[in-house]
UniProtKB/Swiss-Prot annotation:
Residues 1-25 form the signal peptide. The gene is MID2. Residues 126-175 have a biased composition (Low complexity). Cell wall stress sensor. Involved in activation of a response that includes both stress-related increased chitin synthesis and the MPK1 mitogen-activated protein kinase cell integrity pathway. High-copy activator of the SKN7 transcription factor. Required during induction of MPK1 tyrosine phosphorylation under a variety of stress conditions. Required for PKC pathway activation under low pH conditions. Required for cell integrity signaling during pheromone-induced morphogenesis. Activates ROM1 or ROM2 catalyzed guanine nucleotide exchange toward RHO1 in cell wall integrity signaling. InterPro entries: Mid2_dom. It comes from Saccharomyces cerevisiae (strain ATCC 204508 / S288c). This is Cell wall integrity sensor MID2. The chain crosses the membrane at residues 225-245. One of its GO terms (molecular function) is transmembrane signaling receptor activity. The lineage of its organism: Eukaryota, Fungi, Dikarya, Ascomycota, Saccharomycotina. The modification Phosphoserine is found at S260, S327, S329, S355. Belongs to the MID2 like cell wall stress sensor family. Glycans are attached at N35, N211.
């Protein structure tokens, strides 16, 4: 009877512990209500705990019926029944702790630690219960020790499952790395990129047009001033330079001569431009003067008269010679007449020819040829 009461008290203690675990699970569910996934997993854990408690109660009922039947049996069979009942109760406890710890590991790291502490309390309570049952009989103590040795093997699997929260920290680290933004500038374009998107910023067309519209040159007023200075100073300067070039290089130098009649004759010398051009072509350049009208021509010999007028002048001069001849024949001196009618060789000459030689002025060209209005 003592063992029966001990078993009942042990079962009541297990019920109390299961209730406490459910209350703790509900408390942790309320604390993690911000996370929807944690709430759902916590609710599933609560439902599993309730199902495990119902299984535990049914096992207790079955164990009580087994105990009642064992009282009618012998002592050896009674110890055997107690051994099996204790092993089943320990197995149910280990199963309960396993299911609860596996559910709590998915909720959060804090709930996993609290659930692992609750599972440890279950193992302690089971250990104390088995120690009490070992005092009843030696065979039950050996069975309980064997069950205790089997309990850590079953509880070792929750320890491996509870180490899962250490891997749950990696999403936060990857989220931090994925949230980082990389900024780069390529060919004048700014590129912002992270794990999800890539944004490219290019200079706007309005900015380019505004920069092009801005001119860095002179203003309109200054430009007009510059144009006025160039036109007002540059154009007269160019005209002066052209005039100097014409006067000293292109214009031919001229010289005025006076002939025997007192007329002015103009002679021209080759200009510098012509000299340079002849030198370039390899021609001989002379500094002699050249006149438009030849020296001793009709204009100079006849006093600016043409050929017909010169003929009239010559006829008048011949008449003048005849008059002189008549006056010479009146003189009684024959020697003078003979002297006038003979030349240096003693030949008789015409007096008109002699008078023409005195009146007529002769002109010669550069080659020594005599120039006259008729043979020119």
């Amino acid at each position: 009877m003592l063992s029966f009461t001990t078993k009942n008290s042990f079962r009541l203690l297990l019920l109390i512990l299961s209730c406490i675990s459910t209350i703790r699970a509900q408390f942790f569910v309320q604390s993690s209500s911000s996370n929807s996934s944690a709430v759902s997993t916590a609710r599933s854990s609560v439902s599993r705990v309730s199902s495990s408690s119902s299984i535990l109660s049914s096992s207790m009922v079955s164990s009580s019926s087994a105990d009642s039947s064992s009282l009618t049996s012998s002592t050896s069979s009674r110890s055997l029944v107690s051994h099996t009942s204790s092993s089943t109760s320990i197995a149910s406890i280990s199963f309960t702790s396993f299911s609860f710890s596996s559910d709590s590991s998915t909720s959060s790291s804090s709930s996993a630690s609290s659930d692992s502490s609750s599972s440890s309390s279950f193992s302690i309570s089971s250990t104390s219960a088995t120690s009490e049952s070992s005092t009843s009989s030696t065979q039950t103590s050996t069975s309980s020790s064997s069950s205790l040795s089997s309990t850590p093997s079953s509880s070792s699997s929750p320890s491996t499952i509870t180490s899962a929260p250490s891997t749950s920290s990696t999403p936060s680290t990857t989220a931090y790395n994925q949230g980082s933004t990389i900024t780069s500038i390529i060919n004048g374009k700014t590129i912002l990129s992270n794990h999800y998107t890539t944004v490219t910023y290019t200079p706007s067309a309005t900015a380019d047009s505004s920069n092009k519209s801005k001119s860095s040159g002179l203003s309109k007023k200054n430009r007009n001033i510059v144009i006025g200075c160039v036109v007002g100073i540059g154009v007269p300067l160019i005209l002066v330079i052209l005039a100097l070039i014409y006067m000293f290089c292109i214009q031919s130098s001229r010289t005025d001569f006076i002939d025997s009649d007192g007329k002015v004759v103009t002679a021209y010398r080759a200009n510098k431009f012509t000299k340079w051009w002849y030198m370039l072509l390899g021609k001989k350049v002379s500094d002699e003067y050249h006149s438009d009208s030849p020296l001793g021509g009709s204009a100079s010999s006849a006093g600016g008269l043409d050929l017909d007028e010169a003929d009239d002048v010559m006829e008048q001069s011949s008449l003048f010679d005849v008059r002189i001849r008549d006056s010479d024949s009146v003189l009684p001196n024959a020697n003078t007449a003979d002297h006038n009618n003979t030349n240096s060789g003693g030949e008789p000459i015409n007096s008109s020819v002699a008078s023409n030689d005195i009146i007529e002025e002769k002109f010669y060209d550069e080659q020594g040829n005599e120039l006259s209005p008729r043979n020119y």
